[in-house]
Amino acid sequence: MKITLPAPAKINLYLDVLGKRPDGYHNIKSVMQTVDLCDEITVEMLTPTPGLQSIQISCSEAALPCDARNLAHRAAVAFFNGCNIYDFTCRIDIQKNIPMAAGLAGGSTDAAAVLRGLNALSGHPLDTDALCSLGAAIGA
């Protein structure tokens, strides 16, 4: 089973950094707007091999890491751990249209699309609040 989802870019119309938190991140106040520019994320669940945890990432942008450094990979790990799924095999294909390091949330939106895709393919075990909590835990 597989699903393809858009991962829209966003721009900050207003951003105020309020202070550093104990976890090293900053509290912010922002107003943002999605734009028409999107990455395209395809998530595919494959038949798992007992005892195997496999996340395979491919990307149209050669400079993007396709391993645990990628937020899409971290999102998949967070999803499977959050659902107590310990045997899994999935493929994630990232068609990059959002420029890297442009401040348009390309990595974050890709991770969010992976969470939404895995949740849909798994029969929606997590509600929106749980998905948001996983996303917040992944980082930026």
Give a label for each model feature.
Residues 1-102, 120, 124-129, 138:
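ATP-binding N-lobe of GHMP and related small-molecule kinases
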Residues 132:
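Extracytoplasmic/periplasmic copper-protein system
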Residues 108-122:
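Short, small-residue alpha-helix embedded
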